[in-house]
């Protein structure tokens, strides 16, 4: 990503109230993008590069660690590097196959990572599966979801099969927002839409519908 793109990206993100993050792939990039980013993302392939993680952590900005291909020891080492600099990273469970086979997604590792790292844990998606994302959020409580977006299906990486198109991810976001509404408050009480129907229940005295007071009202 050319550095001269960042001022415009930063301004647009500010207008849309979106945080801007970026993945540095060389050490100098950490400082080059410092004034523009709200967080740094360490890609799975750079998770073993201590110097890069330490350079990002020294800025005190938020850090997201993607953990594709990594074992627990490698993940904890990266987390410890951040912690030593006073940063609590966000950890993303990930499968670094493009696209990720459903058989290898292993979403239950989100719980494992959360318990072992004591970090917020999310999911970095390469599956392009609505089911995977919904399960990551609502069964395994993923705190963050990362995905690859191709605007028109013409990008260089689209042919590998791990990128979402705008209409696809729009549907996922719609489902997530609806699910939040569907889950509700958890309080068991009559909903607003049920209030009128309550009048038509069987009366506790004679078992007939509607309630006696409703019968009296309707004659």
Where are the regions that the model predicts?
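Catalytic cores and adjacent flexible loops of soluble metabolic enzymes
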Residues: 1-219
């Amino acid at each position: 990503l050319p550095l001269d793109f960042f001022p415009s990206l930063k301004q647009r993100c500010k207008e849309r109230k979106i945080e801007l993050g970026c993945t540095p792939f060389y050490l100098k990039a950490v400082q080059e993008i410092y004034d523009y980013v709200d967080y740094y993302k360490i890609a799975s392939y750079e998770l073993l590069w201590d110097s890069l993680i330490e350079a990002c952590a020294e800025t005190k900005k938020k850090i997201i660690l993607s953990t594709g291909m990594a074992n627990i020891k490698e993940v904890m080492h990266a987390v410890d590097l951040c912690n030593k600099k006073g940063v609590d990273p966000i950890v993303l469970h990930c499968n670094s196959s493009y696209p990720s086979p459903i058989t290898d997604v292993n979403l239950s590792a989100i719980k494992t990572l959360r318990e072992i790292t004591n970090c917020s844990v999310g999911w970095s998606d390469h599956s392009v599966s609505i089911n995977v994302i919904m399960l990551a959020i609502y069964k395994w409580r993923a705190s963050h979801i990362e995905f690859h977006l191709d605007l028109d299906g013409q990008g260089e990486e689209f042919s590998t099969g791990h990128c979402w198109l705008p209409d696809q991810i729009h549907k996922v976001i719609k489902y997530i927002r609806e699910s939040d509404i569907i889950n509700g408050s958890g309080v068991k009480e009559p909903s607003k839409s049920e209030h009128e129907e309550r009048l038509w229940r069987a009366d506790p005295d004679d078992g007939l519908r509607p309630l006696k007071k409703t019968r009296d009202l309707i004659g």
